[in-house]
Amino acid sequence: MSGSRQAGSGSAGTSPGSSAASSVTSASSSLSSSPSPPSVAVSAAALVSGGVAQAAGSGGLGGPVRPVLVAPAVSGSGGGAVSTGLSRHSCAARPSAGVGGSSSSLGSGSRKRPLLAPLCNGLINSYEDKSNDFVCPICFDMIEEAYMTKCGHSFCYKCIHQSLEDNNRCPKCNYVVDNIDHLYPNFLVNELILKQKQRFEEKRFKLDHSVSSTNGHRWQIFQDWLGTDQDNLDLANVNLMLELLVQKKKQLEAESHAAQLQILMEFLKVARRNKREQLEQIQKELSVLEEDIKRVEEMSGLYSPVSEDSTVPQFEAPSPSHSSIIDSTEYSQPPGFSGSSQTKKQPWYNSTLASRRKRLTAHFEDLEQCYFSTRMSRISDDSRTASQLDEFQECLSKFTRYNSVRPLATLSYASDLYNGSSIVSSIEFDRDCDYFAIAGVTKKIKVYEYDTVIQDAVDIHYPENEMTCNSKISCISWSSYHKNLLASSDYEGTVILWDGFTGQRSKVYQEHEKRCWSVDFNLMDPKLLASGSDDAKVKLWSTNLDNSVASIEAKANVCCVKFSPSSRYHLAFGCADHCVHYYDLRNTKQPIMVFKGHRKAVSYAKFVSGEEIVSASTDSQLKLWNVGKPYCLRSFKGHINEKNFVGLASNGDYIACGSENNSLYLYYKGLSKTLLTFKFDTVKSVLDKDRKEDDTNEFVSAVCWRALPDGESNVLIAANSQGTIKVLELV
């Protein structure tokens, strides 16, 4: 490129059109030297046809000349000048002033030669969407490799280079260009031209591919018409355009209709496949139901059941809106049964059956889901089928066993009527469930004897022993081996070992840097206990040592800690990172499992069994986990818990937790919905006697089961933020 730009620096006298220029110059000189010149005007026009330019004038000036890109300006006497520089918008050269100063006519009686049409309309087949701003004034085509002169005009590089070799003036304004090297690339124009070409190619591509090959020629003509002036279209052209547009419209409508039918067909096929899968599933479930019904009928023949009383309300299946369709004839009275013939049967059987049917109706969807999840998990041999059916029968029996919650006794943790806060934070039974301890924000631990509380006819109960701490108490835990050994944690981060019957302190641990939320004794190792704190540490303590024996870095505030009931080495704790962490104490560097699923901080983590953990969070959910699986087995919803510690306890089958609507909620571990609830009465103090019951912000804050050695556990104790403690029984 540099070599081509530097090659040649010829002047105007050596241009390819020097002969034509000299003839015009001589004619002008002769006219100016005549004393009385005739009235003659010189006009030059370059006609673009076949690459030949001709100049004509009166008096025989000029003949056939070589085609030139730019002719130099010729000056004559009288200030007249003839210029054949091609304009931006015209194919013809502008006529110059002739003798006598006339610049527009050849004489008073001469005819005017009409100017040609503008560029784009003057070119044949110029349907391209050209812009005059991008047309080279020399070659009348789209600029290729735009270069700019000092005067600011842009041309094709080849065109301006060749023009300047012939003449050192700008073809647009006759500005003198001293050196051919004084050309500069116009990057902006090049970029705009490139975009213009891309738009044109996209437009051409769409039009070329929108019709079939049979109509390609007609659409090519249609494209040509789009680039022409509207005034040049006649009626035949317009009719043809309308015909093409109508054809295109019909084609698009047909394609649209075909697409709609295709979508409809796909929807119908997917719906049919889903329904077939559902039908297959229903058929499998029906076969399982028929099999189990026969098995239960065979088992019923081995017993002599008490006949049903006709006065007992029959079980009514939920409506189809509850996703349960049950044949009503299955629950109709057997033939020959009458109320009079059965009135002498056991009344307890009738009442029990009626209450269980009521609970079955209320929770039919959950029970149905539980049944099929149990039975359809693995369909194998008869022994496996029998065990699955027995498993569901046990689940159904436990779910329908209890109908209500009955209060047995009421206690008060509040010290006086004017005490503003009496929140009970923890309740725990001792090893033999003979005594229970209550602790909370009043900084006191009160120990009561269970039998005394239950047997007293009065509502005022006094503790067997009372211990006072230096700070608010967050948690307490009884030793499973030493009946009198009790541990407590408080808001100062202190862990204290007490003699629960004498009230004496045996150990004080003060290694936590922040508030300690939880403490728990190891059920298998009576000397080991653990505590969790806001300092993101879980510390392990030994009752015969003054310092901690190990520490686990949790990287988040620890809200609860609990040992496994079946292993001395396994520990679970919940954190503010929304997770439950499960550790083996033989390797405290990393957890065995991290259970993720809660949306907020985990406030409690309790073992339901040696393999199952239930966790509570301030996202108003309980979640059941298996220690060997990272996913949640079941979520329990119904209670409200968004900011407070509301308590959590389990006896192996049932889970109890508090709620921020001042109620106690009970769940069965096999079903997600609430089993039973118990509402605490709002006890107003002297200062709150004018406040409405709905305005209270009381919540159940602690709960504990009374687990008997034989495994039966239908008694629990719950307390709320007012300091009211209820001993409750499931009936």
Curated annotation (Swiss-Prot):
Set out the biological process GO terms recorded for this chain's protein.
Answer: positive regulation of proteasomal ubiquitin-dependent protein catabolic process; proteasome-mediated ubiquitin-dependent protein catabolic process; protein ubiquitination; response to ionizing radiation
Coarse class of the primary localization is nucleus
What is reported on the regulation of this protein's activity?
TRIB1 competes with substrates for RFWD2 binding.
Provide the residue span(s) of the region labelled Disordered.
Answer: 1-40, 305-325
PTM note says: Autoubiquitinated. MTA1 destabilizes it by promoting its autoubiquitination.
What pathway is it annotated to? Protein modification; protein ubiquitination
GO CC aspect terms: Cul4A-RING E3 ubiquitin ligase complex; cytosol; Golgi membrane; nuclear speck; nucleoplasm
Domain comment, as recorded: The RING finger domain, in addition to its role in ubiquitination, functions as a structural scaffold to bring two clusters of positive-charged residues within spatial proximity to mimic a bipartite nuclear localization signal (NLS).
Would you tell me the protein name for this molecule?
Answer: E3 ubiquitin-protein ligase COP1
Gene symbol of the encoding locus: COP1
